[in-house]
Regions:
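GST-like domain detector, emphasizing the conserved glutathione-binding G-site
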Residues: 1-128
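A local structural micro-motif
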Residues: 30, 107, 184, 204-205
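Short, solvent-exposed turn/loop segments enriched in Gly/Ser/Thr/Pro and often Arg
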Residues: 35, 163, 209
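Non-catalytic alpha-helical scaffold/packing segments enriched in small hydrophobic residues
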Residues: 70, 74, 94-97, 101, ...
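GST-like fold's C-terminal all-alpha helical module
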Residues: 104-198
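Long hydrophobic alpha-helical segments typical of transmembrane helices together
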Residues: 185-218
Length: 218
């Protein structure tokens, strides 16, 4: 199989998710950075590959895959060991719901392009945007804590990482990067984070381990 190519941005939560999934599956891949600070995702060259102009995009098996959850689902089907979803239909639905609560409920409201729009187009102050971010983070993580607590072990579902953890870890990273909100009210999430970050598959995907991760965004 030709080496897959991940069109990536070191600090993107969605890209971070896919890096984790690729590492968990043991897939060797090439990372090509698309610098969001320079609007490279809007270039004609990149939009010819991905009309949405988002990262990540994964070129694999002759396909160009977009949207992080779709990519992760493809990887789980293409490389079934280790599985990122349980076998039981009900348990599978629960894990998918937890993953979606992060990727579809929290992340879109606190995405960088939304925060910049609030500031530049809506005229909101830095303080107001910070309040917006903290509000949706706290509300979303509170819900996820309640969803995860009944089935959690070392991770959000049992004692092995699933797609829910793949989505959680980047969101907690961004929460710490962009707000001073205490996360102590989420012990289940923090336990999963500690166990995940002890695994090389998660640690190697961390933004600071990427080539461009040494340049800190101001």
């Amino acid at each position: 199989m030709p080496r897959p190519i991940l069109y990536d941005y070191w600090r993107s939560s969605a890209s971070y998710r896919v890096r984790i999934a690729l590492n968990l599956k043991g897939v060797d891949y090439e990372s090509r950075q698309v610098d969001l600070r320079k609007d490279e995702q809007r270039s004609g060259e990149y939009r010819a590959l991905n009309p949405q102009g988002f990262v990540p995009m994964l070129a694999i098996d002759g396909h160009r895959l977009t949207q992080s959850l779709a990519i992760i689902n493809y990887l789980d089907l293409r490389f079934p060991i280790p599985p990122l979803l349980p076998a039981s239909a009900a348990e599978r639905a629960h894990v998918v719901a937890m993953a979606m609560s992060t990727a579809c409920d929290i992340h879109p409201l606190d995405n960088l392009r939304v925060l910049l729009y609030l500031k530049k187009e809506m005229g909101q102050t830095e303080e107001a945007v910070d309040r917006w971010y903290a509000h949706w983070i706290e509300e979303g993580l509170s819900a996820l804590e309640a969803m995860a607590a009944p089935t959690a072990g070392k991770f959000l579902f049992g004692d092995a990482p699933t797609g829910a953890d793949v989505c959680l870890i980047p969101q907690l990273y961004n929460a710490r990067s962009r707000t001073s909100l205490s996360l102590d009210a989420f012990p289940t999430l923090l336990r999963a984070e500690d166990n995940a970050n002890a695994m090389e598959a998660f640690a190697a995907a961390h933004p600071d381990r990427q080539d461009s991760g040494q340049e800190k965004v101001q």
